[in-house]
Regions:
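Cofactor-binding active-site loop characterized by glycine-rich and histidine/acidic residues
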Residues: 20, 33-160
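Structural motif
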Residues: 25-33
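N-terminal capping segment at the start of a domain
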Residues: 9-26, 171-173
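Thiamine diphosphate
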Residues: 106, 110-113, 117-220
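Glycine-rich beta-alpha junction loops
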Residues: 66-67, 71, 173-174, 208, ...
Length: 266
């Protein structure tokens, strides 16, 4: 997918996030908007995925599961789920819940409890090696999620086993549920911390699609896992949501939805 198509996909994801959240009257909007470009890069170019039932396709795990709506939009764009499933977001009508559900095609692990996705991803990467498969495993975590001790246990495990087929992506938007990450637990500089554990760390603009694609595709020749630290803006694309913590949980009213949709489409 060329750059213009990637930008169109990112816009489609943002529209779906806003529409789905408004229809269900739920929050987690800012978190999903911040990863829209990352998801577009993955599903539009980077991931080697043709069929959901291909045992050797790449795996993607959204560890920050509350942003699942962005992934559902990408799965719909690829034709892996239909519009009816996406429209049933956060209802009893489908498995498209607030957090990813492995009953949906393309969802490899049900997440929601933070800190678990990378643990699963390291196991999946090791399993691929033992099976002689060329599949890669990508895991998207949040910077606030790196407060969890289980993340660093996984980081040590992956480096020890030299899992070069594992790529972690950190959505570094600097915010979490109730405050800024540096105020809750300052982990800066994240790049140096991951590198100290033996990972190849790459710091990128999380909204620059060509830069994202280059870093995510990367070079698998080195026998070490990779981490892409994507500097993003919480609520990206909607001016009144950007860096505004209340949009972690806040649903939109009708006027806010119209304004947000207009900004994303223009």
């Amino acid at each position: 997918m060329h750059d213009d198509s990637l930008r169109a996909l990112a816009r489609e994801i943002r529209v779906a996030v806003l529409t789905g959240a408004k229809r269900a009257n739920v929050g987690h909007i800012g978190s999903a908007l911040s990863i829209a470009d990352i998801i577009a890069a993955l599903y539009g170019r980077v991931l080697r995925i043709e069929r959901p039932d291909d045992p050797d396709r790449d795996r993607f795990i959204l560890s920050k599961g509350h942003a699942a709506l962005a992934v559902y939009a990408a799965l719909r764009a690829r034709g892996w789920i239909d519009e009816e499933t996406l429209s049933g977001y956060c209802t009893d009508a489908t498995f498209a819940g607030t957090h990813p559900d492995h009953h949906l095609p393309g969802i490899d692990f049900s997440t929601g409890s933070l800190g678990q996705g990378l643990s699963f991803g390291t196991g999946a990467a090791l399993a691929a090696r033992l099976q002689g498969s060329g599949r890669r495993v990508f895991v998207l975590v949040s910077d606030a999620e790196c407060n969890e001790g289980s993340v660093w246990e996984s980081v040590m495990f992956a480096a020890h086993h030299r899992l070069s087929n594992l790529v972690a992506i950190v959505d570094a938007n600097g915010q979490q549920a109730l405050d800024h990450t540096h105020r809750v637990l300052d982990l800066s500089p994240l790049e140096a911390r991951w590198a100290a554990f033996g990972w190849r760390a790459h710091l990128v603009d999380g909204h620059d699609l060509p830069e994202l694609c280059g870093a995510l595709s990367g070079d698998d020749s080195s026998a070490a896992p990779r981490v892409v630290l994507a500097q993003t803006v919480f609520g990206r694309g909607v001016s009144f949501m950007e860096r505004a913590i209340k949009w972690h949980y806040m649903p939109m009213n009708d006027d806010e939805y119209r304004q947000a949709l207009d900004q994303v489409n223009h």
